[in-house]
Amino acid sequence: MWTLLYDAINGSNAVIANIDNASGTDADKVRIKGQALATRGYMYMMLASHYSFSIEKEPNAVCAPIWLEPSNSITALQGVPASSVSEVYARALQDLKDALEYIPENFSHGTVSTDQYKIDYLTLLGLLARTSLYAAQWEDAYNYAEAALKINPYIMNETEYHAGFNDCSNKEWMWGLTSTLDDNMPAYTFYFKDTTTDGAYYTSLCADPNFVYDNFEEGDYRKDMYILGYTQQGQEHKMLCTKFRFKDVDNQLADILLMRTSEMYLIKMEAAAHLSGKESEAQILLQEFRQHRLKDGYTASAVTAAGDDLLKEIWMERRKELWGEGFSLTDIIRNQQSVVRKQCLIQKLDAEGNPVQDSNGNIVMENIGHTTVKLPDGTDFVENSIYYLLRIPEQEELQNPNLYSKYPKSTLYR
């Protein structure tokens, strides 16, 4: 991940440094510079949210180097010092805010399928909302999410929600990568997600049955996505999820979701819960959002939780809504929470549905939940575990002589 992020940063730096002298219209060059700034800001947000603990825990902890100019083989070996997590977030936010000056408000990737990867004005607002939330800039997170929702407030209905999360034409999607027969590289990141469609071959992305059983209220149509069954090729009896399904099974194609409006609603309510005088608004927003995910005939209960209890309810709503979309680890880190894993034992049944017994006539139980319930060192899962973070690669430590010249190497890695 480190190399992927810095490759994108270096490419963005090259565009920013050279676009003014490139051929093309001034309008195109200005917009492209804005998109390069937004891309760089997005990459720095990814570094800050994965290589350091929460900014609220250790704002001055070492995180990652900040490069603002294109590098080459010489400058790369000279290296630059790693900045703190607060500095990396500040850089990310500055790049994204600068991009607002370059990407016109009326620029949209529209409905052309092959343009969905482009960062348009709406996508930029979404990136600002997400990054502000991660950086604990609650007012900015609220305002940017609200601005994005003014442009696109659409929320999927039940039919759309069960359509497979595989098509950029979905009106709730704000950003995505299309996959076609001519350009199918994005689909490679979808393969592991579809564990239920005939013709799919991966079996790894299964849900925690305890999460499903304990947290979805009656009438929540999202719960219908989770089914107890056998993974492809009948390998394991697990809690499967039908959320992600190939759009074209024969060619194993599916569009890749990067951002949607539901995330903006969740950002807005979480930010509101942190802001003075907006707690009641956060409660109403949460109730309204839950109502959208209920089947006809059901009514969401009023939200009465306050303070930390309200935040925990919002975080759980994020888990339920954004499951499998790449947010859970980041949320655990930034909210200083613990991974929760436990077994889920059920009565084992044979092919005819009869209880299986051992040689002594005892009912046989099987675990359909997690098989790994401890950290790699054998200890219990805890908040702020080093195992939740990605580590600065050893290659960077060996090749960058200035890496820890500004902020010391974390004692966790010594």
Language-model-derived ranges and their functions:
Residues M1-Y51, S83, L100-E105, N251-I256, ...:
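Conserved, well-structured interaction surfaces
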Residues I9-S12, Y89, L96, A145, ...:
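Inward-facing hydrophobic residues that define packing positions of alpha-helical scaffold repeats
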Residues Y89, W138, K278-E279:
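TPR-repeat structural position
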Residues K97, Y121-I155:
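Aromatic-residue-lined binding/catalytic grooves and analogous aromatic/hydrophobic interfacial grooves
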Residues K118, Y142-T261, D296-S301, G307, ...:
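Hydrophobic-face positions in mid-chain alpha helices that act as interaction patches
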